[in-house]
Amino acid sequence: MKEFQVYLELDRSLQHDFLYPLIFREYIYALAYDHGLNSSILVENLGYDNKSSLLIVKRLITRMYQQNHLILSANDSNKNQFWGYNKNLYSQIISEGFAVSVEIPFSLQLISSLEEAEIVKSYNLRSIHSIFPFFEEKFPYLNYVSDVRIPYPIHLEILVQTLRYWVKDASSFHLLRLFLYEYCNWNSLITPKKWISTFSKSNPRLFLFLYNFYVCEYESILIFLRNKSSYLRLTSSGVLFERIYFYAKIEHRVEVFDKDFPSTLWFFKDPFIHYVRYQGKSILSSRNTPFFMNKWKYYLIHLWQCHFYVWSQPGKIHINQLSEHSFYFLGYFSNVRLNPSVVRSQMLENSFIIENVMKKLDTTIPIIPLIRSLAKAKFCNVLGHPISKPVWADSSDFDIIDRFLRICRNLSHYYNGSSNKKSLYRIKYILRLSCIKTLARKHKSTVRVFLKRLGSKFLEEFFTEEEEILSLILPRASFTLQRLYRGRIWYLDIFYFHH
């Protein structure tokens, strides 16, 4: 390790350019074990002490440079041994260590950017539900919406080259190429999805980092052009596509792109366009005509094709009118509903009738997909009729009731923002009867007999959760105000969403 000591003692501002020595540090793998791998399983499986683990990792990296087949393909056996050790497991160790190392400079950049902008960290902004108040505020004034699914996979060589622009460490990315070589069709411009699936399952941390970096790079270009388009002008659409291709070939991309772009497309000038993304799905909405939305649509397609070499079909990006079509996002169907109202006004002896139309965001629960999910989990059949869950029949009564109540509360917690609660009540009804049938099956009784023995208090537990939350939030509020809040509530403590 003495030969790497000179790199590790560099100035803190320059250390992000030398990530390769971090791969040989013991604590990096300790972090990887905490986040991903189980250290107890490693010790049992590998049979080595922690003092010799670093030596084995160094040997594996050296062997990788000599032979490009340390990482096994999907058809190879997981039991093959390399110096008496599991190949796939060690490749996972190194990939986890690399992922932890390469995340360090981006974390430092994020912290410094927050400090420079004096942005106060708020956990409420991390909530998935925080996007829906934004929809309620902005979308009633917009006209068109487009569902955009970010295409993947991109050519991994393009991804590595882009990553090298942000982290200037050639040695680390030579190692990254060796990892990716066995998981993709290197001679093809479009990586087969089956290789991506294999890579994401065996190296989840590294895969998530690479995917998030790809999305970040795509959005940085999108935001840059969006900010430039508010005051610049151009008359030819062909220049944009040439600039994108030119932009991909320039070493100092952002600086050159900024200087060499004295004018941006005037027909992108749209101060009322909004962009929202969660994972691989994004929403693009505007208040202008479909002409502007189509320009953005074809711009995105050419951006993916010319810069990331990803093929995307224009027919898969649909532009719909918000007042006539719903868009599906984060488990809700949302659209802008027209709410007409009539007001009678009287001035002296004359009376007037004023008709007014208010636009309001309407969010509904996708009842059919939810019933399909419940049917797949054996809570009901495909028609939505509740059935017993025999897998849980061996558990105690308390555990069975607790499991059903937990699922019911989670669904109620997430879908309490629906404009119409009938679908939510139907889901809770299915879970309630499924719980009763499971208990009746366990005790070899009928549902009617079992309900008589339990009483009506058991059923109330499935419906009183909302009222308990409201009583905590609004302890002194009037019944009318509580009823108003009962219409739609967004919670800011939901940080992830299971599909």
Swiss-Prot record:
Keywords: Chloroplast, mRNA processing, Plastid, RNA-binding, tRNA processing
One CC-aspect GO term: chloroplast
Biological processes per GO annotation: mRNA processing; RNA splicing; tRNA processing
InterPro entries: Domain_X, Maturase_MatK, Maturase_MatK_N
Pfam families assigned: Intron_maturas2, MatK_N
UniProt keyword Chloroplast present: yes
A single MF term (Gene Ontology): RNA binding
Localisation: Plastid, Chloroplast
Family listed: Belongs to the intron maturase 2 family. MatK subfamily.
Annotated function: Usually encoded in the trnK tRNA gene intron. Probably assists in splicing its own and other chloroplast group II introns.
Name of the protein this chain belongs to: Maturase K
Species of provenance: Gleditsia triacanthos (Common honey-locust)
Gene designation per UniProt: matK
